[in-house]
Amino acid sequence: MTQNNQKEETSVTDTPSHRSQQAIRAQNQALILAAAEEEFVLQSYRGATMQGIADRAGLPKANVHYYFKNKKNLYMAVLRSIIQEWNEGLVTMTVDSDPKTVIEKFVRTKLHQAFVNPSRHKLFAIEVIGGAPHLHEFMSTTMKEWVHDKAQVMKEWHKQGKIGITDPLQLLILIWATTQRYAEFEIEIVGLMDK
């Protein structure tokens, strides 16, 4: 074997130029998603425009189309990022987990998210109140499977005597309702708390 054959080939995707392009892509996508989230909250899905999102992101409209193709794809990306962030608190939940620790962490995480970024909750609420036209399929498949998986773990906890909850779905709904209330009705909550 020659010395040249022994050398590892450098992949085109592992060059400094490619890594730089990936970093720019990630940065642009993050800028666009943040701008889109703001625009959708302020203007609604119907009122938001790709130009408005581009202006808010400080990027050319062509970049927004390059990364997300159209408004619907961008809106779905924003909604999915919201759901993904919310559900992170229960990702590592297993039958061997301590229910008190898991549920407490989930509630604290959800409350923190509601206080830090209430607009995300408002955007999701607007979508759901409107009949979830963009999320209906996602909610009836991916989200439903996720909830079912978490409910199964909670049922196992109940069988093991770790929790007294017999209907885990109702517990999840109660946690969502309670934590999201702080964001969706921020004006009311702040007024009641004299803040």
Predicted features and spans:
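Hydrophobic alpha-helical connector segments
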Residues: A77, V91-K122, P168-I175
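Helix-turn-helix
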Residues: T2, L31, E39-N73, A77
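Short helix-capping/turn signature of helix-turn-helix
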Residues: F68, I126-G131
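Amphipathic alpha-helical packing segments from all-alpha helical-bundle domains
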Residues: Q84-V91, V116, P133-K159, Q170
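An amphipathic alpha-helix adjacent to DNA-recognition modules
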Residues: A26-A34, R46-G47, Y67-V91, S140
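N-terminal intrinsically disordered/low-complexity leader segments
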Residues: M1-Q27
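Hydrophobic/aromatic-rich alpha-helical bundle segments in the mid-to-C-terminal region
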Residues: L123-I126, H136-S140, K155-K195
